[in-house]
Swiss-Prot record:
Cytoplasmic side: 734-903
Keyword terms: Disulfide bond, Glycoprotein, Heparin-binding, Immunoglobulin domain, Membrane, Proteoglycan, Repeat, Signal, Transmembrane, Transmembrane helix
InterPro entries, per database record: FN3_dom, FN3_sf, Ig-like_dom, Ig-like_dom_sf, Ig-like_fold, Ig_sub, Ig_sub2
Gene designation: iHog
UniProt keyword Membrane, yes or no: yes
Superkingdom as given in the UniProt entry: Eukaryota
Name of this chain's protein: Interference hedgehog
Residue ranges with Polar residues bias: 427-439, 676-689
Length: 903
């Protein structure tokens, strides 16, 4: 027997939260409704009760929705197991061993067959048990009973009736017979078998519209359909039919031996025939009514017959009193009361449901059922009776209380409701969150891969041990034929920070033990913030697996101290091909709501005919629409969820989303892709960021890059620097403007300062570029016209008046080489100017005693005395001088040609 499928449900049991599900079908009639299908593993076909004679061989069949690791059968003796009402006794079930000559167990994929030889010591109750790892699913009980037929007492009745023709006669032949299964009846008239018009039950013979041909002696015979045993009833009835001429008018009345009332018990779904005994002359007519049952007579299931009422597909609400009135016009009328009881197999109306429970907490599981007779409830915890569990107590209303939940309770919890008509079961997965045991510093790891190395951290003697809280065992869900999805969580703790996770898995085979394989991806822990009271949840997928193989998985956590610790391993998981699984409902994405700059809300729905019981939760996949990378994943627990918020997104970014539903066994197809975007960032009115509370809505622009969040500060720094630079430049320009000549605009004879400043800089300002300084001699040729103009100005400005300090300049060192052609042009212009001045001087030499000496070859002493004031610089080749002013544009041009500089 291959352990393939069994692992599938085992894993789901311990880590997956499912709604309560009906596990198997009770032995209802075919017409009765069956429980809705359930996710995961369930009993598709439970063994059925059998009545057989001694020495016969019977076969019990049990089928599960998935192939388990193994089947087992349990048994307890029937006489001690239940009383006549079918209530459960204290006798315990025992597991059967095949091959002892009395029974044999065979298995074919997901079907198990138990062959039993009917003997007194094999009569009793049988159960089928499917093992899926630590998960146990138990079927309802099937009974093996001996076929028997017996007669209650030996009282014989011999009746003689005389009736008028046209009446109907009811004879109860088999009131004293008890048969298992119910006997079939044969009727004889004068030793010849007859076929009654109406197939009455319980040995009742009903003769309608009798005539003289109906007269004779009637007898009956009971046959056991299982064993074939026949019992001839010694009672008889002799019928005499009067002629029409000899009959007298008589009111309706009962014949001798006929009861005045009846009590009828029938099973739900059967056909009920009510007969109204009584004869009269003339023939009476039957009228039916019921004070208890609404519309008991006038409905589609009821048919009124001559002296009878037939109700098909009897329901529980047909229970009540029916009254038959016989009237033939002769008073008084005859009333006949029939009390009808409809027995209903048990139905669980409130199945148990369990959530994740912490170890040591108290838990109450509720289960309610209906049925006639009232069903009795009992519980199984992973196939074991709750009566044998010291922590379990069943309340009078049938609820189960676990005073202290233990790890052994994790698994499948089933509630059973039973009466003499059958059983029904519903179960739920119980998850137990174990108490966290603080880990001591360890020297070696266990297993392979990351967990097998020796910790290199030194031992801190006398200090509190380092706490490394491991993650929970992963919950496995099938995604495809080659991939699964793992879900796990880290409980709230104050231990070491987890940096990232690794996923490890290994294949389980019957041969050599396989080593653990480690995936390449690091699953980041993220921000050290708890998402809920239970801790923080994570999701990861594992691909490149092989279908029809069994695997185990575990999660490896790497901590901030560079050590690691692995979780407990998952249950064995059988990766079943998708073709063998029931398809899951596919959700339909309706809308992607823009919730904030960092979050959106998904809205979806299921088809109207989709069964939510198949769903454990949903997987949401999302990524930026401009990206072709991997999808981010989010897990949504609960089948009833119809919306979910996804946060930590980028502002003003378009994303694409898709959904799929999942259960403990498989996942659905993906929904159609739908795009949505986050809100645009809001305009900020202040340079300082606003600190928000925990409950405030996040309106900041999120980013996965921490440096991007500092961009407002960086922008402010750059802006402030630019503003400061502008202020400095403005101040410099303002100072330069203030140092411009104060007399600008007062006379047209002032030289243009912009042109002069191209060659000179003010005294006291920054010195010329020192990097390009070099020693050179500068020869300045004075403008003769300027000397004459300067003499005139000196006459207007007597000595003693202060001169304008702004007119003092020193000449810049030239940064270019003069063109020799320009130098020759300047020399020729100078010579023409000298000749002109000489002519003018010769003509006016006698009359101009105070004229300036325009001889350019004058000595340096004369030039120092009469010319502009000149100051030698400490550096060679530099001359500080007061520049003569030009009186006109032509003079400026002449000055420009005469002020040639030779180096």
């Amino acid at each position: 027997m291959s352990p393939l499928t069994s692992s599938l449900l085992l894993f789901s049991l311990l880590t997956s939260s499912l709604e309560a599900i009906p596990v198997l079908q009770p032995s209802f009639p075919p017409s009765s409704p069956s429980p809705a299908p359930s996710p995961g593993v369930r009993i598709l076909r439970a063994p059925e009760s059998i009545v057989a004679p001694l020495g016969d061989e019977v076969v019990f069949e049990c089928e599960t929705s998935l192939q388990p690791e193994g089947f087992e059968w349990s048994y307890r003796r029937w006489p001690n197991a239940a009383n006549s009402n079918g209530s459960v006794g204290a006798s315990r079930f025992k597991y059967l061993k095949s091959g002892n000559g009395k029974l044999n167990v065979t298995q074919e994929t997901a079907i198990s067959r138990l062959r039993v030889l009917v003997r007194p010591d094999t009569v009793g109750e049988y159960r089928c048990i499917g093992w899926f790892g630590p998960l146990v699913v138990t079927s309802t009980t099937a009974r093996l009973e001996l076929a028997n037929t017996s007669v209650k007492g030996r009282q014989e009745t011999h009746l003689q009736w005389r009736v008028a023709p046209g009446n109907s006669v009811l004879w109860s032949c088999g009131q004293q017979v008890h048969s298992n299964p119910s006997a079939s009846w044969s009727y004889y008239r004068n030793g010849v078998e007859i076929k009654p018009e109406l197939a009455a039950t319980n040995g009742n013979l009903f003769l309608t519209n009798v005539s003289t041909a109906s007269a004779g002696k009637y007898t009956c015979l009971a046959t056991n359909p299982a064993s074939g045993a026949r019992i001839e009833i010694s009672s008889s009835m002799v019928l005499e039919v009067l002629s029409g001429r000899g009959s007298q008018n008589k009111a309706p009345h009962l014949l001798s031996g006929q009861p005045t009332s009846q009590a009828v018990t029938i099973r739900e779904g059967s056909t009920l025939l009510l007969l109204c005994p009584g004869v009269g002359s003339p023939t009476p007519t039957a009228v039916w009514s019921s004070p208890d049952v609404v519309e008991a007579i006038h409905n589609k299931r009821t048919r009124v017959l001559n002296h009878g009422l037939e109700i098909s597909n009897v329901q529980g609400h047909d229970t009540g009193t029916y009254i038959c009135y016989l009237d033939n016009g002769v008073r008084p009328t005859l009333e006949h009361f029939i009390n009808v009881t409809v027995e209903v197999p048990p139905r669980i109306t409130r199945p148990p449901w369990a959530d994740l429970t912490n170890e040591g907490e108290r838990m109450q599981l509720e289960c309610e059922a209906t049925g006639v007779p009232a069903p009795e409830l009992y519980w199984l915890l992973n196939g074991e009776s709750s009566i044998n569990d010291t922590e379990a107590e069943q309340l009078p209303n049938g609820y189960l209380v676990l005073h202290s939940v233990q790890k052994r309770h994790a698994g499948y919890v089933q509630c059973f409701a039973r009466n003499r008509l059958g059983e029904q079961s519903a179960g739920t997965l119980l998850q137990v969150n174990p108490k966290q045991i603080q880990s001591e510093p360890r020297e070696t790891g266990s297993g392979g891969g990351f967990g097998s190395h020796r910790s290199m951290k030194p031992v801190n003697h006398g200090q509190k041990p380092t706490k490394m809280i491991p993650p929970s065992p992963p919950n496995v869900t099938r995604l495809s034929d080659e991939s699964v999805m793992l879900r796990w969580h880290v409980p709230r703790n104050d231990g070491l920070l987890i940096l990232f996770f690794k996923v490890q898995y290994r294949m389980i085979s019957e041969g050599k033990r396989k080593n653990w394989q480690t995936t390449n991806d690091n699953i980041p822990y993220g921000k050290p913030k708890w998402n809920s009271e239970l801790g923080k949840s994570f999701t990861a997928s594992v691909t490149d697996l092989k279908p029809q193989r069994t695997y185990r998985f575990r999660i490896l956590a790497v901590y901030s101290n560079n050590d690691n610790k692995e979780s407990n391993t998952s249950a064995k998981f059988y990766l079943q091909p998708g073709a063998a699984l029931e398809p899951m409902p596919v959700p339909e994405l309706l809308e992607i709501e823009e919730y904030s700059e960092t979050a959106v809300v998904l809205h979806w729905r299921l088809d109207s005919d989709a069964d939510e019981h198949l769903i454990t939760g949903y997987y949401a996949y999302y990524r930026p629409s401009s990206s072709a990378g991997e999808y981010y994943k989010a897990t949504i627990e609960g089948a009833h969820a119809r919306s979910f918020q996804i946060a930590t997104l980028e502002a003003a970014t378009i994303y694409e989303f898709k959904l799929q539903s999942f259960s403990a066994v498989s996942a659905s197809e993906f929904s159609a892709l739908k795009q949505g975007r986050t809100q645009r960032p809001k305009a900020s009115t202040t340079e300082e960021p606003t600190i928000q509370g925990i409950g405030d809505r996040d309106t900041t622009t999120p980013s996965h890059n921490e440096t991007f969040s500092m961009s407002p500060m960086l922008t402010g720094t750059i802006g402030g620097g630019a503003l400061l630079l502008i202020l400095l430049v403005s101040a410099f320009l303002c100072m330069c403007r203030r140092r411009s000549p104060r007399g600008r605009g007062q006379t047209q004879n002032k030289p243009r300062m912009a042109e002069l400043r191209e060659d000179f800089v003010p005294l006291g300002s920054c010195s010329p570029n020192k990097q390009r300084q070099r020693t050179r001699h500068i020869h300045i040729t004075l403008n003769p016209l300027a000397q004459q103009q300067q003499q005139q100005l000196d006459e207007k400005n007597p000595p003693g008046l202060e001169t304008d300090n702004d007119m003092a300049y020193f000449q810049r060192q030239p940064t270019y080489e003069y063109d020799p052609g320009l130098r020759r042009m300047s020399s020729s212009s100078l010579r023409r100017s000298q000749r002109t001045l000489e002519r003018a001087g010769g003509a006016n030499s006698g009359g101009n005693n105070g004229g300036n000496n325009n001889n350019l070859n004058q000595s340096s002493e004369a030039g120092t005395a009469d010319g502009p004031c000149m100051q030698s610089s400490s550096k060679p080749g530099r001359v500080i001088m007061k520049r003569p002013r030009l009186s006109s544009r032509s003079e400026n041009l002449s000055s420009g040609s005469l002020n040639s500089v030779g180096v």
